[in-house]
Amino acid sequence: MSKQLQDAYIVAASRTPIGKAPRGAFKNTRPDELLVHAIKSAIAQVPEFDTKLIEDAIVGCAIPEAEQGLNVARMGALLAGLPNTVGGVTVNRFCASGITALAMAADRIRVGESDALLAAGVESMSMVPMMGNKPSMSPHIFDRSEDFGIAYGMGLTAERVAEQWKVSREDQDTFSVESHRKAIAAQQAGEFKDEIAPYAIVERFPNLATGEIDTKTREIALDEGPRAETSLEGLAKLKTVFANKGSVTAGNSSQTSDGSGALLVVSEKVLKQFNLTPLARFVSFAVRGVPPEIMGIGPKEAIPAALKAAGLKQDDIDWIELNEAFAAQSLAVIRDLGLDPSKINPLGGAIALGHPLGATGAIRAATVVHGLRRRNLKYGMVTMCVGTGMGAAGIIERL
C-alpha cells in the first residue's frame, strides 16, 4: 500500500573550519573529535529539541579506517553525548559520502521510517591518507580494458578530462585564482560565520628554560586554505604533477584537508512538536556513473538527473556548490552543461577552501543552507565528481 511521501526538513547545519593536511591546524586532532564538534555545534542550534528523538547518525567518510574506523558514526554520536539509543552507520561514496549521508537521512524521513536523523561527514587526511594505510586494488581490473581506468590516479583522470574537453592550463589557473579571490572576500565579509563553529586546539611545545611542556590554546575560526597572494603568474610557474606535458598542477587542484560537518534532519511531526524553524527542505538526490578514467565529468550526468527528480530546470537553481576537485573537471562540467558561472561557488571552492573527502558533501550542504537564507535565494545544489567514475548531486530548497 503506497502512501504519500513527506518532506524532510533541515533544522540545523554546522561545520568545523577546514584545516590544511597534513601539516595544518588539525594535524594532531582525531577525526572523531572533529565529528563530535560538528555534531555538538549543530545540536546547539536547536536547544529546544530533545536529542532522544534522534534514531540514527548517518556519517559519510571516504576512508573509514584507522582513526576514523570502528564505525566512526557510532563513535561520534556517543562521544558527542547523544543518548546511547541513537544508532550510527558510516557510509562511503568517496567524495560524495557526506551528501549521500544527507540524502539517506532525508529518504528515511520522506518514506516515514524515521522522524529525526543526524547526517554528517568527516575526514582527516592528516591522519588517514587518501588511499588508506594499505591500499589493495583487485588485480582483475586489468582483465578487461574497460576497467583499466579504475587504476588511474585522480590527477590522471583530470588530465584526461582536460584533454577531452579542451580545458587549457591558463583557463584552469584563472579559475583557481578566482576560487581563492572569492574565498578571501567571503571570509573578510563574514559569510561563513553562520556555518562554522570555531574550534579550539591545544598546542604543546617544549619550554627550554624550564624543561617542561607548555601548552597554548588557539581558536580556529576560518578555513586555512584560502591564500590572498594567489596569482595567475604564481600558478603559471608550478610544474605539472601527473603528466609530463599535462596541465594539472597542485595549484589548480583541490587541497587535501581535515574537517567535519553535520546537519539535523526531521519530519513535519517533529517540527510541530518542538516548534522548530526549518532552514531548508532536502528536495532530491541523484547519482550517475561515468567511465572511471574521466571521473571528473560525473556531475554532468548527475545534475540533470537531480533536476528531473525535483521537477526543476537548470535555471531554477540559484546557488551551485560544485566541488572543485580539479579546475579541469569543474570547467568541463560548467561548459558542457552551460551552467551560469555567477552561480558557481560564490564563496570559493575546494581549490581554495579545501576538500576533506567524505566530509565535503556535508560541509558544502551547510554552506548552501545558510547561504540561501542569507541571500534570500530559493534553490541550491551540492554536486561533485566521485572516484572510480561517478557524479552526485543533491538539491536543497530554502524555506
Give residue spans per PLM region.
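Conserved beta-ketoacyl condensing-enzyme motif
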Residues: 26-117, 122-140, 196-220, 293-294, ...
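Conserved catalytic cysteine-centered active-site region
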Residues: 29, 61-115, 149-156, 228-255, ...
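Active-site-proximal alpha-helical scaffold in enzymes
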Residues: 91-123, 162-192, 262-269, 334, ...
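Short, well-ordered amphipathic alpha-helical segments that serve as non-catalytic structural scaffolds
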Residues: 31-47, 72-76, 101, 155-161, ...
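Conserved N-terminal phosphate-binding loop of PLP-dependent enzymes in the Aspartate aminotransferase
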Residues: 2, 70, 121-123, 130, ...
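N-terminal extracellular/periplasmic Venus flytrap/periplasmic-binding protein-like
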Residues: 15-17, 28, 37, 48, ...
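Condensing-enzyme catalytic core mediating Claisen C-C bond formation in acyl metabolism
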Residues: 2-31, 230-297, 301, 308, ...
